[in-house]
Amino acid sequence: HERRQALKGYLPARQPNFTEKLELPALEDFSQLLEEQNKEISTTIAFVRALNVMLKNKSIKDRLVPIIADEARTFGMEGLFRQIGIYSPNGQQYTPQDREQVAYYKEDEKGQILQEGINELGAGASWLAAATSYSTNNLPMIPFYIYYSMFGFQRIGDLCWQAGDQQARGFLIG
């Protein structure tokens, strides 16, 4: 019975809110993005810059979960490889071809990017797990599922419907 008490009962339950307070970045932290840009930038680059601001915030940086269903380089995210690494439970098992480059493909046991390969459903499932962690584990995460718009919902539409039913909290960036 002790284990059931620690788990707060015999039936699984989703909590409507989490108990931990997160200190979010102030709007001023994003001032470089809010000011007029000298030259045009893509929305993807704007997102990566905003993500970099959030990664500097000590309260939420470990809660950020960038999930990419395909090659991160095409989204301009290769700068994050060295900064936070690509999650791999076994770490780097090979020498990357691009090892000599500044933004080489760095896999790490403590990596934060989930690089799912061409597996939209797997990436969507990872996003759903992180997006509902607040209610199932009292552990609020901030997941970003980054995908190609032309493939996005066509491949994970049902999963998105499920996310709505489970009151998932996260971002879909297409």
Question: Which residues are covered by each model-predicted region?
Answer:
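Thiamine diphosphate
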Residues: 1-174
